[in-house]
Amino acid sequence: MLLSRMKPAVGGEASTSSNEKKRKNKSKKIPRLEDYLNQRDYLGALTLLEFQRNSGVSVEHADLWTGFCAFHVGDHKRAMEEYKALTLRPDCPVDVWVYLGCALFFLGLYKEAEEAALKGSKTQLQNRLLFHLAHKFNDEKKLMGFHQNLEDVTEDQLSLASIHYMRSHYQEAIDIYKRILLQNREFLALNVYVALCYYKLDYYDVSQEVLAVYLQSIPDSTIALNLKACNHFRLYNGKAAETELKNLIDISSSSFQFAKELIQHNLVVFRGGEGALQVLPPLIDVISEARLNLVIYYLRQDDIQEAYKLIKDLEPTTPQEYILKGVVNAALGQEIGSRDHLKIAQQFFQLVGGSASECDTIPGRQCMASCFFLLKQFEDVLIYLNSVKSYFYNDDTFSFNYAQAKAALGNYREAEELFLLIQNEKIKSDYVFQSWLARCYIMNQKPRQAWELYLRMETSSDPFSLLQLIANDCYKMGQFYYAAKAFDALERLDPNPEYWEGKRGACVGIFQLILAGRESREILKEVLPMLRSTGNPQVEYIIRIMKKWAKDNRVAL
């Protein structure tokens, strides 16, 4: 069956009158620059301006608008070139110098930006630019001067909020953004800024809620989707974060190219450092966090020297930078036995943990715990760790530090439980872990487990140190059988007279426990070979006494 057509497939235009065609053509408006600007379609406006320039169409202030649009699409180099060309003209408006300063600022040319801005007229834009430059130059006096010139208008208040954010005063920034939002509900992008502040305050769930408001209206925002991925990383894991980031890559919006480096950087973080050496080094001067994450990568690889080289010349300005410098100095101090580096680390931790903005945050309290840990003030360590332990359920690194503090204060039972919760193989193979666990076993009357821990250790210098610990701790605790075994093993490795004295005392101690009925008589069979392995004249005298007692008490040797 053939279906008849209501309209012809081709040639339908023939029925349209020429008058109707003219009417339709007239209804198609030629795009105007004002329309693009009103819609904030700066890329469209820039395209139109370029077309008009190439076509020889004269537009009033075309060069100014070209610089303006280039700036707003993120092409700051193009904006700089346009504004520089304008400054060479004798009739150049004085405000152009400030616009040039803004472009130079975003290119990281701060000195040149200041020089250009000072040639411009004294406007609120100039004040805001100089305000931000004072922050970049760490010039507190100038910063406060420009701060006083700010007015209670949206642009100035947003500028102030930005400075608060960069100085880690996140709550102050939130207060400003919320106040502006109450007056201007249509300023949806401010929700992203608020969400960023909550992210920095570690309130990842709150950040996610605020961000959702913006994403409902602008679902393909690069910055918002990237922040959502970062929240997922903090709330869940790297896999969940990577899924969110892949959604961003799939969208490939017009701003995707601009955020390419950011996405590459974050993928490395979400994947636990995979590809760090290929991706992060070129981004060190592009993304501030790239240097910090590369330092973290080196720390995880136990390459403390490389981590130190990368961060030693960094002048910290944020809590994260102070913390990381503290961690690197602490690790280096422990590795090379440098008290100076440990002292620097302690000072960095104290600076962050004692600051008004960080003292009640989780990282701030961890810093104070680290500070007191280095000072060996373990009661204070526990005060701070107890206050944040609910946030670190099943966190092996936290459990490791918490257990050490407990053990240092003699809470061996709790410390043992914490040590045994740890699943991370790297931590479990660390001598510090093994020595503390062995001590806990011994103090909790479990010397056999401590001995088995030694037997499982691979051949290195560490087993010798662990043997010394087991020998001495078992001796102190009256666990003479395992003390004797440890001193015997030490003596075979190093014929030091002190080890013989320890073994002799432990063997006599075992004999005393047997006499008191607190140790099995059968152990005497193991004691005699240990004594005979030493060529000391005292050996025969001790063995003779033990043999006589065994004979009198019908103990087979």
UniProtKB/Swiss-Prot annotation:
Sorted UniProt keywords: Cell projection, Cilium, Protein transport, Repeat, TPR repeat, Transport
Main location group: other
Annotated coiled-coil segments of the chain: none
Gene3D superfamilies: Tetratricopeptide repeat domain
Reported consequences of knocking out the gene: Defective cilia. Morpholino knockdown of the protein results in cilia defects in the pronephric kidney at 27 hpf and distension/dilation of pronephros at 5 dpf. In the eyes, the outer segments of photoreceptor cells appear shortened or absent, whereas cellular lamination seems normal in retinas at 5 dpf. Left-right asymmetry defects with abnormal heart looping, hydrocephalus, pronephric cysts, abnormal ear otolith formation and curly body axis.
Residue windows of the TPR repeats: 60-93, 95-128, 154-187, 471-504
GO CC term, one of those recorded: cilium
MF GO annotations: intraciliary transport particle B binding
InterPro entries: TPR-like_helical_dom_sf, TPR_rpt, TTC26
Compositionally biased tracts (Basic residues): 21-30
GO biological process, one term: axoneme assembly
Compartment(s) of residence: Cell projection, Cilium
Family membership noted in the UniProt record: Belongs to the IFT56 family.
Described purpose of this protein according to its UniProt entry: Component of the intraflagellar transport (IFT) complex B required for transport of proteins in the motile cilium. Required for transport of specific ciliary cargo proteins related to motility, while it is neither required for IFT complex B assembly or motion nor for cilium assembly. Plays a key role in maintaining the integrity of the IFT complex B and the proper ciliary localization of the IFT complex B components. Essential for maintaining proper microtubule organization within the ciliary axoneme.
Subunit structure comment from the entry: Component of the IFT complex B.
Protein name: Intraflagellar transport protein 56
Annotated organism of origin: Danio rerio (Zebrafish)
Encoding gene, per UniProt annotation: ift56
